[in-house]
Amino acid sequence: MNLKKLLQKGILPLATLLVAGTLSVSCSKDNEAFRPTPEARPAEPKVPPVKKSIGAATHKIVVNTEKGPGEKVKLLIYARETERSDVFIDWNNNGTYDEDTDDLVTKFERDYTKGASYTEYELKGRDFAVCGKVIRFAIMDEKIKGVDLSGNTLVKALALAGTKTLTLTGLDLSRQTDLRELLLQSVVLPSLNVSQNTALERLVISKTPLTNINLNNNVKLKSLLLNSNKFTSLDVSKNVALEVFACAGNQLTSLDVTKNVALQQFACTRNKIRTLDVTKNTELVLLYVGVNSLTTLDISKNTKVKDFDAGSNQLTSLDFSRLTQLEEVQVTDNRLTALDFRSNPNMKLVACSLNRISSAAYTQLINGLKVNTEGLILVFSEAANEQNEISDAQVTKLRSEKKWKVFKQKADGTIMQTTVGNQ
């Protein structure tokens, strides 16, 4: 059985748009009435072929790499259809288009979350510029040293991702005041300032060494994914428009989400949080708080929750009676003595191994479950610290009467189906 995890990549899918841009050169014929007669026509000098003319670039993004000529870099470039004819890669970064050396951009993609959206370009130097009115730009490469956006204030979406680790000395976004989306993944940089990016709606930062970030000015944020960093504290009190918030895998000891009343999905797993108030988050559909240090959790106001994970805490009780839309519960490795699902008719997944559920309490749990041929339940572990007690007869009832598939976890962590209990 594969227990689901929330937003492992810290990114949500976006629509993809692929439009090929074309360039053409047209030549007009001379008016026949004004042509001299053959006898009077002077010899015409040889004129070199007309080249595509693009004026000096008024907008550009300058990239500095550790790679050399002949090596390749993956870029995603997007401009509005009416602006595409002047978008090119300036390989010598001189600000003008040279048909002999520079590349016109003919592939425009929006979705930086898909590897197939990126185009591989062959470098002709270490520094190059992406010129034109580009509004979405992304790089997938670990050998980028710097990205200078000061020459393009139109950028609305920026994504920088290293296939391993991308190290930058800094990233200045102060002029990108209309930036709506920012993704930094596997990027090492000393700090990040997004205080000028007040239009931000989506911010994804993952696998970085960042320890703090100021989000007070980013009041339009709707999606905030900050998984797998080094944050020791986060203040989201001003981000009242948030609908999706994930901060798994950091070093948080406390977190206040009482002002984030619009939240629909929230995950703070793999931190060190001791107390958490989610009573104001009444719109939550997904709530993941596993692998923390919680001893109590009031979920009585989270009546819309369908997917709940509080595994690996120190919880002694949980009341699901008001969560009538609940479908999936993962509460392994706690100190729970009982679970009651009589008020939860839509249950289809329960993982409750490594608790202290007695045989009598298991009877109550089983009786509360509705018949479900797609139901999956993890009832005990073979680990030495397992204190759940479930009999062969109870497993049989789960399988035969309730039609659930019953699983156990072996000492090595492997999960497999079982037809017998541990008592």
Predicted regions and their residues:
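Composition-driven detection of intrinsically disordered, low-complexity segments
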Residues: 9, 13-14, 235, 256, ...
